[in-house]
Regions:
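Alpha-helical membrane insertion/targeting regions
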Residues: 2-255
Length: 255
């Protein structure tokens, strides 16, 4: 049977391609988090740890943030695998609870790390990160509410939005390294302070762009040749960014 008999098949196939690419990149990212910060927690080489002597609150929240970053990266991919949802629904429910609680705790600890402990990027970048966090909190609550009400179609939509928002930090790194691969130089930003028009734009695009593409997918019900082409192009761009991030950012820090 040809694709005309199944108008949604090209988009479904393209979406599946993007998911496979993203799942691979997220697995690499999760491995990086586990190895890099696990080594630091066990007393690895100086300079790898972001802990500050005597800052028990900051260090504790940093630990919470990193642990949930690792868990959310791994669990998020598992939650989107259809056979797992169908064959082991109890596991899907329990992992979903961990994911939503982790998203909330990771976001709240992130607010502290950005606004109290401090990080690079300046006010614009911090505001974008905080807006991303507010989206995460809202999507987590809405996904939980719909699941409790057994409105599973709506729950799935909010859970997908939550997945995109939670992975904003990953999208940022992939987008940044794709940009650097294209220009072969830090065009549009200062790499020392992480300020400048490009990183400001990317700070918002890291969650707004994935959410926009997801909304197009949900509202068109997976139909449309242009959407399929867009998803294939995004898959290629994502693969390029993953390669750049792996070779230029993650791998050098763990070997």
């Amino acid at each position: 049977m040809n694709s005309a008999s199944h108008p949604g098949r090209p988009v479904t196939t393209a979406a599946g391609l993007w998911f496979l690419v993203a799942a691979t990149g997220l697995a690499i990212f999760a491995s990086y988090i586990g190895i890099s910060y696990g080594r630091a927690a066990l007393g690895g080489p100086p300079g790898q740890s972001r802990w500050v002597a005597g800052d028990w609150l900051g260090n504790g929240l940093l630990s919470v943030h990193l642990v949930f970053a690792l868990l959310l990266t791994a669990i998020g991919v598992l939650q989107l695998i259809p056979p797992l949802r169908r064959r082991v629904p109890a596991l899907h429910r329990n992992l979903g609870r961990v994911f939503m609680v982790g998203a909330v705790l990771g976001t709240l600890s992130g607010f502290y790390l950005v606004w109290v402990k401090g990080t690079v990027g300046g006010f614009v970048m911090h505001a974008a990160i905080s807006l991303n966090g507010l989206f995460i909190l809202a999507f987590a609550w809405l996904a939980w509410r719909e699941a409790r009400a057994r409105r599973f179609a709506e729950h799935r939509r909010w859970a997908l939005r939550l997945f995109m928002a939670v992975n904003g930090v990953w999208f940022f790194r992939v987008g940044l390294m794709l940009w650097l691969m294209v220009w072969r130089a830090p065009v549009g930003f200062d790499p020392k302070t992480f300020t400048g028009p490009f990183v400001y734009a990317l700070s918002f695009a890291q969650f707004l762009l994935p959410l926009l593409v997801l909304e197009l997918y949900l509202r068109t019900r997976g139909r449309g040749r242009m959407l399929a082409v867009t998803l294939v192009l995004l898959s290629l761009a994502t693969a390029g960014g993953i390669f750049g991030a792996t070779m230029g950012m993650w791998l050098p820090r763990v070997v």
